[in-house]
Structure formats: structure tokens, C-alpha cells
């Protein structure tokens, strides 16, 4: 990995069809505007099916009724998922009230889905409501630009740090990076906001005419919390503070979790440390990382196009030196930092400014009025009286931020009355799933609908072995693309087929180690049998403070993944 050129800087060969699509799209316009007026289908045609992703949307259908509709000779019930751009997950109560109303009035499912990319999604937007959703977002100062496809996606930022003044500084940087790396095309404004076409030619000085080779994810993280799971991301800025003031960042590049079942050219990878940079170089370095990946990333094979593969192909040192050259700096040695956890601190936490933050556990991030737990109504009622903001966390929870002492009791009463503060065990708080069925077209197995009952069973195992208040970081992802971040969990389930999963073990609590596959293509009873035995051993044999993942490695149950490019599949 330290050789100058383990592989070529640029991969020669026939470009993937996605590259043709981007090149011919006229800076992401395609024929989306014309397609919107085609009432014969609920979906988008041809290239537009993929181009709408650059505008923050995915075309989906309800897979629960797909076969039934096919039998009736009907096309699938097409509807769009829309993902908002929300750097750092901060949303005002005015914005919240607007999205609450849109979800209720204009989506099939009526829900707001908080995601582990620290934003919200609407599921089930019919084609006739696609333009109105963008206009609604714009009216409250939001957009969905660049939240999907080959761009820098929503920038994450630690939600509830131990030093709250650091959050304000780090959050400002998350916003600046997001804005700096946005596409410059006017396609979004023209298509969705009816802004006039301008005679000037579009230019993309950072992203280029064909944008990035693949999705690109960025974080700003404030130790000791690794709530944003930095090792799942392409570019990570670890905040370094002196006397409570942000002075610079450690840069880590090349994390990513997506794999393809059976494709040994794909693997999950933790990010590599490049070095420390003072604050004034932040945007130049961020741009240099992105443009290096733009120019060197593999455009012939999308399965091998992410930054992690570029680093492995050209060598970490070569990539780092190119970033230094483009940014005009030399990285200083990495400054010391450590992580102690990545879960959210559920409940009230007092900030340094004497205001309070209330973190609410939202199982799988799904905000809806459930029987006996009207969560969506409760949050709307809080939004009506709260003077501060809401923050969406990368664990799919919600923080009512900056609550003055005088409002605390009133907000707590509303939260309790609407089931937003029901007691849950630590295991549930540390479990997470992606959406998967029925809306995700890539889903191979259930995730969000499977996790609550599966967690019940894991809690029963913990109880049986006398450790009911312990927790294991547990994630379920419906397919190997890995949106549920199972590849950084202590127990990771990756969907293989309906009712079947690959079981990965050996990650750690702080999210710095990739888990290895322990058993392949097994059913829930098989998974529970394995976990029952191993959790029993952990309860008896663990050392003081030893997490489940660390125990499985120390006890020789699983070999740790040390160099994923070479040993992930062993």
C-alpha cells in the first residue's frame, strides 16, 4: 500500500453507460421536464429514471403489491422517494411544520423517515406531486439537490457533542463544505422552481461535466463521539480543538461499506489517515480530495468506482500526495483523537450555554402516528411551541435542541403524552435498520420491518444470560449496498434472500473495525441459535468493559479484518 503505483492512476477501457448518460444529459436536465407532463405512466422514462437521482429522488414501487398489479396487467405503482439536503441534520421548526403537512397530504405512506445520513425522506410521492415537493422545500429554504447519485451527498456532523460550542463551529463547516461541493448546473432551479433558462453555458469547475465516478460521502466528526460512523464515508474531517476552540481537522479518506454478494473485487473498508490541516485549508483540501477522485476514480466499472477502490489501486501515499499538490499544502502529522462511543445520548443533556437538548429515540427513524403512540402529532405539537431547532442524528433519532429551562417541562410533557419518551432498553437504542421492503427496489430481505421483533428476541437472550442492560451494536441492512451500516456493527445482518441473511461478527462498539462474515445465507432461527450461544459465552467469559465484538475477536470466534482489500473475504 505504500508503493508509489500499485496500479494505474486512470483505468482505461470502455466507460460505463452511466458515464454516457451524464455526458448526454445537458448538465442533468435530460428530458425530465417533458417527462413530468407524460400522464400515461406514473414513472420516468429512459435516462430520466436515473437522472432524477441527481435531483434527490429515486423511482420506486410498492413491492408488496407488485405481483398483484402485474396479474391485473397494471404497471407497478410507481412513486418517488425524495431525500432532503440537510447538512448536519439541523432543521427549523418552521421547516418541520411544512414537511409534516406535506407528508400527511401528499405521500402514500404519510410518514417522515429519518435516515442515518442525518436527513429525512418522503416515501410514496406520486408523479403529480413531484414538482410541488421541490417547491414546498424551496419555500422554507430547503432543497434536495445532490442527495443521491454521483455527487457529494448530504454532509454529516456530530449531533450532540459533549462541548456544545464546538457543534456550532463544526456545523458551520459542514454547511460550507456542502455548499462548496454542490453542482453549479441550473437544471434543478429550471425544472423544479420554474426559474428562467440563462443564456450562459453551464460549468462544473469542481465536479466536472460528467460529475463524480460514484457517490461520495463526507462527515465532520467531533470526538469522542463517532455517531456519524466516519469509516462509512469517503472523506472525514475529525475536529481538533484547543481550549474548547476548533483549530483544525484530521483528514481520513476512503471509507465505505457497500459490497456485492460473491464479488471479491468489492469489500468494506475503513478510512485511511492522511494528516492534520489547519482550518483555513479546509475547503481547498475538501475540493482536492473530490477532484482527485473525480479524475482517478474508475469510470469503467461502477462496482469498483468508489474512493476506497481508487486508494487501493493507486496507493494511499500517491493519493495523499496528489491531494497535497492540488491543495497547495503539506499535511501535518495526525493529532491525537479517540472515540468512546457512537450511540446517541437519549434523554435530556445540558449544553454549555445552559440550554437543554432532548434526544428522542425514534425506532428505525419512522415518524408516523402509531396506535397509542402518535409520534408524528407529538413532534408537530412540539414544533408549534419550540423556539430552538430540531437535529436529526445519524442514528435516525431526533434532538429537540436548545430548550430553555422555562420550556423544559412543557416539552417533556408533550413528548411523554405522545409516546416519544417511552422507556426502551439499551439494546434497542443501539440497533438500526435501513428501509428495505416494501419500497426499496434493491431489497433482498426485510430490514426495517424485521428489526423490532428481532430485537425483542435478542433482548430475551441478554435477559436469559443475566445482562438485560447490556447492549451490542446491531444493524440490519436489506442488501449488500449496506445503507444500514451493518459492516460497522458488532452484529451485522446483510440480506441475501427473503428471510435469509449473512451474519457478520467482530466489529466494535466505536465503529473502527469491519466485521467478518461468520455464517452465510441463514434464517432467523439459525441466527438466534448462534447468537444465543455466543452471547452466553460473552456474559460468562468477558473481561471488564469488554464489548461483544471485541470478545468475539479475543476469544478466537472470528478473525479480525485487518486489511479489507486482501482479507475481507477470507
Curated annotation (Swiss-Prot):
Molecular function per GO: 4 iron, 4 sulfur cluster binding; heme binding; metal ion binding; NADP binding; sulfite reductase (ferredoxin) activity; sulfite reductase (NADPH) activity
Keywords: 4Fe-4S, Amino-acid biosynthesis, Cysteine biosynthesis, Heme, Iron, Iron-sulfur, Metal-binding, NADP, Oxidoreductase
Source organism of this protein record: Salmonella paratyphi A (strain ATCC 9150 / SARB42)
Single biological process term from Gene Ontology: hydrogen sulfide biosynthetic process
Protein name: Sulfite reductase [NADPH] hemoprotein beta-component
Annotated family: Belongs to the nitrite and sulfite reductase 4Fe-4S domain family.
Enzyme nomenclature, EC number: 1.8.1.2
Pathway: Sulfur metabolism; hydrogen sulfide biosynthesis; hydrogen sulfide from sulfite (NADPH route): step 1/1
SUPFAM superfamilies: Nitrite and sulphite reductase 4Fe-4S domain-like, Nitrite/Sulfite reductase N-terminal domain-like
Gene for this chain: cysI
Cofactor: siroheme; [4Fe-4S] cluster
Catalytic activity, reaction form: hydrogen sulfide + 3 NADP(+) + 3 H2O = sulfite + 3 NADPH + 4 H(+)
Main function: Component of the sulfite reductase complex that catalyzes the 6-electron reduction of sulfite to sulfide. This is one of several activities required for the biosynthesis of L-cysteine from sulfate.
Note on cofactor: Binds 1 siroheme per subunit. Binds 1 [4Fe-4S] cluster per subunit.
Binding site for siroheme: 483
Pfam families per the UniProt record, alphabetical: NIR_SIR, NIR_SIR_ferr
Quaternary data: Alpha(8)-beta(8). The alpha component is a flavoprotein, the beta component is a hemoprotein.
